[in-house]
Amino acid sequence: MTVGLYLYGIFPEPIPDGLVLQGIDNEPVHSEMIDGFSFLYSAAHKEKYLASRRYLICHEKVLETVMEAGFTTLLPLRFGLVIKTWESVTEQLITPYKTQLKELFAKLSGQREVSIKIFWDNQWELQAALESNPKLKQERDAMMGKNLNMEEIIHIGQLIEATVLRRKQDIIQVFRDQLNHRAQEVIESDPMTDDMIYNAAYLIPWEQEPEFSQNVEAIDQQFGDRLRIRYNNLTAPYTFAQLI
């Protein structure tokens, strides 16, 4: 039993039926043209979908399949968006935001979003920071085994934190220097885990991704085993498709 329509994204052109065989709940995916905008959708079995790994992957896979077929300009919609009627889309989205939607399509045309997430080993970096600063290491070692007052604890903690932060910023600056000038736009987001030190998305010309990927690989080789770099070269442009 269906209770509405599950929406995946908006395109500036019709998407052929059958391009994506299955979407959420194994339902076939279709497109609906409304006032010049093509909405990718499938029948919804629920009014609200939990953000399970299976559902999230399916949502992303639908958009990626369409992108791989050549429909690369799109505005992805958030996971779990279910509507009752197309009239609600017109009233709540198209009518109030039509100009902004067209501006976003113009901005994203011929562009793609890629992203990097950089991880390091916190404990290794802490030890390396101390080894690179003999004076700090000597001061830290001299305090070990002693009953320190709060002021002393804060003092040595701040010195160590500042040293580690400089190492982190030096790494991040390498990525900025070598990648930012290749992008039309860069958005840096907060790290998502304790061992993640950098999280950035880049809007780049579609055909320049291979060159961008080579730059990421060169940086990876520069740092060797010190870093783990997670590079995503095919993702719907969530970061750059925000309605203001």
Swiss-Prot record:
Entries under InterPro entries matching the protein: GvpL/GvpF
GO biological process, one term: gas vesicle organization
Protein keywords: Gas vesicle
Location in the cell: Gas vesicle
Region feature C-terminus, modifed ferredoxin fold, mapped onto this chain: 110-233
GO cellular component: gas vesicle
Cysteine disulfide partners in this protein: none
Description of its domains: Has 2 domains with the C-terminal tail tucked between them. The C-terminus adopts a modified ferredoxin fold. GvpF from bacteria has an insertion compared to archaea (residues 122-160).
Miscellaneous remark of the record: In this organism gas vesicles are about 120 nm wide and 500-1500 nm long, with regularly spaced ribs running nearly perpendicular to the long axis.
Protein name: Gas vesicle protein F
Gene: gvpF
